[in-house]
C-alpha cells in the first residue's frame, strides 16, 4: 500500500520525518513518483540537513553550475513550475550535502597557516612551523612562540585556512612545545584552549594576495576581518609534551573555511626574562571536507550566503578516485616540500652561514704568475 496516497499529509510527514539518515531520504524518493514528489514538495532533505547542522539555516539560495544541470530549461515558466524547479534544486543540493557530511572520509583539514596574534621571533618562530608534525628539523627546533607577557591572562590566537569553504570539523589536536634547549625543559602550554569557526567579512582584504600574509603577527586584523559563527567550550590543556586531542561535543559545519585557535591562561615563565610565553609545535584539524562538491558565495552582513554546487558526483567516490590517481599524494607532497623550504629559510635566519669572502686575483697578478712559470727551467 502506498501510504503517501492513502494517508493525510500530516501523518505521512510524521512518518517520513523519522528518517535520520540522508540515504534513507534518497531511497524514499526513489520508491515511486508520488513518494519523490512528496519528499521534494515538503523539503525532507533540506529539513534533515537543518536538523543535523543548524548552521545551514543561513543558506539563502542554491547555485548550480550549468554543466551539471544542462538538461533544464532556463526559460521562464509559470509560478508553480518555477517553485517546483526551486524545490527540486534544493532537494538535489541538500541530499548531496547530507550525504557528504555523513560519508566523506575523515582527513586533515588545514590548508594553510595564516596569522598569529603575536610572534616572539619572526620568522624563526612563525605560525608556519605548526604545520610540521615534528618539533625539530634536524637539530633546529620547530615551533611557534608568542611574545612574552608579565600577566597570565593575556590570550593568544592562531588563525588557519581550511581546505574548503565547507568542512565538517570533528576534532582539533595541539602539541605544546617543550623547550629542550632550556634548563629544566619547560613546556609552554596554556591553561585552556578554545576554537572558533567562521568566514572572512565581505570587505576584508584577501590574504592570499597580501605581501605580509605568511604568518606575520597581527591581532587586530584577526578581530576586524572575520566573523565567527561557532565558538566551542573551553578545553583544559595539560602541561605535557604530547599531541593533545580535543573532540568537539558534536561535529560542527564550518561555513567559510577559517579556524581560530585561542589559548587562554599562561602557565610557564622563561627563566631568562621572567615573562610568560605560549609555544606550540603542531596543530592538527580533522574532519570531512566538502571542497570538491560545494563553495560558499556572497556572504552578507547577516551571515546569509549562496551555496554553489560544483559537482553532483558522490563525494566519497570522488575521494577514492583521487586517491587511486595519486592526486592527493602529489598535492600533499607539494605542500610538504613548500613547508620544508620555509623551514630551511627559518634555519638560515636562526643560523646564518659564515661565508668567507674570496679575493679574486687581478689580471696583472695572473699575467705575472704566468711569466714566472715560463721563466722556470
From Swiss-Prot:
UniProt superkingdom: Eukaryota
Lineage: Eukaryota, Viridiplantae, Streptophyta, Embryophyta, Tracheophyta
The name this protein goes by in its record: F-box protein At4g00755
Pfam families xrefs: F-box-like
Ranges of residues in domain F-box: 7-47
InterPro entries recorded: At4g00755-like, F-box-like_dom_sf, F-box_dom
Entry-linked Gene3D superfamilies: 1.20.1280.50
